[in-house]
Amino acid sequence: MLKVRVIPCLDVKDGRVVKGVQFVDLRDAGDPVEAARAYDLAGADELTFLDITASHENRGTILDVVRRTAEQCFMPLTVGGGVRTVDDVRTLLHAGADKVSINTAAVNRRAFVGEAAEKFGEQCIVVAIDAKRVSKEGEENRWEIFTHGGRTPTGIDAIQFAREVVDLGAGEILLTSMDRDGTGQGFDCALTRAVADAVHVPVIASGGVGTLDHLVDGIREGGASAVLAASIFHFGTFTIREAKERLAEAGLPVRLDV
């Protein structure tokens, strides 16, 4: 089994971290580069930046953040948010991103995933899926993809969509349960498992982490290859080291060399 990756996620708006980072004594908790450097030193396996800047005009700010982060950090960097064209992907990769995450654009036009993967390689292309459970109690589990921060239903089945984008060339799936996101109640492991069983690429579990055992559940029960969390790390509830030690205690392989 490959080593399980622990991935903090930073939401960035107009070049600033939106959910404050309080876990270390940062001079400027709103500076994403400062936060990224702290996570790098703490032993994070990767970092995800999600650019939630509303307007496309302000894209220059995230490029500056990516450039400065890539200069100072060794961990791989995934950047998502507002990626709509092959040029967007190219620009982010040139700025220093290792992987680019595509969300709404993949829902609107599946072929974009294939075009990006063909141009830059499958290993660079992550498809982010935001899913909500739509099945009723007692029914077979069904999850639907929602866009625009979980507000807009698409009618698209999440499991089928995951299969389609992987067939087109997505090298990884970043899977967020909109039902669990921000609740601290743990991943929707049934959703994670359903997607992990349906595709042959790594699945990153996201949405709902409140305890270290939730991370273990995401791998053990959910079949994920990596776990992503925001609040538990940003607010100092747990450190990256503690997360990895808990995974190791559970018998899961992690990188503990920091």
Curated annotation (Swiss-Prot):
Gene3D superfamilies: Aldolase class I
Gene Ontology MF term list: imidazoleglycerol-phosphate synthase activity; lyase activity
Keyword DNA damage: no
Pfam families linked: His_biosynth (PF00977)
One cellular-component annotation, GO: cytoplasm
E.C. designation(s): 4.3.2.10
Protein's cellular compartments: Cytoplasm
Chief location bin: cytoplasm
Enzyme class (EC, first level): lyase
4Fe-4S is among the record's keywords: no
Keywords: Amino-acid biosynthesis, Cytoplasm, Histidine biosynthesis, Lyase
Pathway where it operates: Amino-acid biosynthesis; L-histidine biosynthesis; L-histidine from 5-phospho-alpha-D-ribose 1-diphosphate: step 5/9
Catalytic activity: 5-[(5-phospho-1-deoxy-D-ribulos-1-ylimino)methylamino]-1-(5-phospho-beta-D-ribosyl)imidazole-4-carboxamide + L-glutamine = D-erythro-1-(imidazol-4-yl)glycerol 3-phosphate + 5-amino-1-(5-phospho-beta-D-ribosyl)imidazole-4-carboxamide + L-glutamate + H(+)
Family to which the UniProt record says this protein belongs: Belongs to the HisA/HisF family.
Protein name per the record: Imidazole glycerol phosphate synthase subunit HisF
